[in-house]
Every structure is written in C-alpha cells, then in structure tokens.
C-alpha cells in the first residue's frame, strides 16, 4: 500500500507543479518516419508504406498534450516518465506512445467497418536553427 501512495504522490506533485512543468522539454516538432499498415478488401491483406512525416507537440490543460499529426489533433494524457495514452472514448480508435530524450514514438490504430489502419511514428525532435550575428 505504501508504494502505491508514494507513486501517486510523485505523479500528482509533478503534474501539479506549475513552475516546473515536465512537459515543457517535450514541446516542439519531431521529424521522422511512419510505418503505415492498411488492410484492403475482404481478404485483409496488408500494404506497408514508409513515409517521412512530422508531428508537433503542444500542451493542453494541466496534464495533457496535443499531438498534431496528419491534419489531425490527438489529445493525450501524459505521465512524467514520458508515456502517454489516448483520451478518446471512441472504441474504434486508440493511440499511445512515449517521449524519451529527444525521441518520440507514437502508435495509432483505427479499426472500423472491417478496415484496419495502423501507424507507427518514430521521430527526433527538430532543433531550431538560429543565425548568430
């Protein structure tokens, strides 16, 4: 019982500390590639495509993040260890992932009407270039 209490308090303290928001280091644009799987037709054969893509991370509320990816916004709940999960109530879609150092991993799955789509994004944080005078 004590380890659970300590864990809960650590997460609560980290999320509630307005002056030291652990999410600040994760904000920005990540460049990488996506491994995309999509079932086609009734036989559910999968096509796999690799594409170069970007994903942008911004804050939402006290504990959330928004991932802007492929013209969609994915709202997630995050933990101070970098893991995040979907906040959606849609039973056909789910997403999760983690941010470790300057790397972001994002998994998305949508299953509806016999069609399945899975995306695995892996990216590195883009470093902004500044011109020094």
What are these regions (language model features)?
Residues 15-31, 126-133:
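N-terminal helix-cap/turn-to-beta initiation motif at the start of protein domains
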Residues 80, 107-133:
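Edge beta-strand at a domain terminus
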Residues 54-101:
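Contiguous, well-ordered beta-strand patches that form the walls/edges
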Residues 1-17:
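Sec-dependent bacterial lipoprotein signal peptides
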Residues 48-51, 89-92, 115-122:
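Amphipathic hydrophobic-ligand
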Residues 30, 99-108:
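A short hydrophobic beta-strand element
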Residues 23-65:
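Short, solvent-exposed loop/hinge segments that bridge or flank secondary-structure elements
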Residues 35-38, 68-73, 110-113:
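Short, solvent-exposed aromatic-acidic interface loops
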């Amino acid at each position: 019982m004590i380890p659970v209490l300590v864990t809960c308090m650590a997460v609560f303290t980290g999320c509630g500390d307005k002056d030291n928001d652990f999410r600040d280091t994760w904000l920005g644009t990540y460049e990488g590639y996506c491994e995309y799987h999509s079932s086609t037709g009734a036989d559910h054969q999968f096509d796999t495509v690799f594409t170069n893509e970007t994903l942008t991370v911004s804050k939402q509320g006290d504990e959330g993040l928004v991932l802007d990816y492929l013209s969609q916004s994915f709202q997630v709940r995050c933990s101070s260890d970098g893991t995040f999960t979907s906040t959606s109530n849609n039973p056909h879609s789910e997403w999760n992932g983690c941010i470790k150092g300057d790397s972001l991993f994002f998994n998305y799955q949508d299953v509806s009407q016999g069609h399945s789509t899975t995306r695995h994004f892996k990216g590195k944080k883009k470093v902004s270039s500044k011109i020094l005078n």
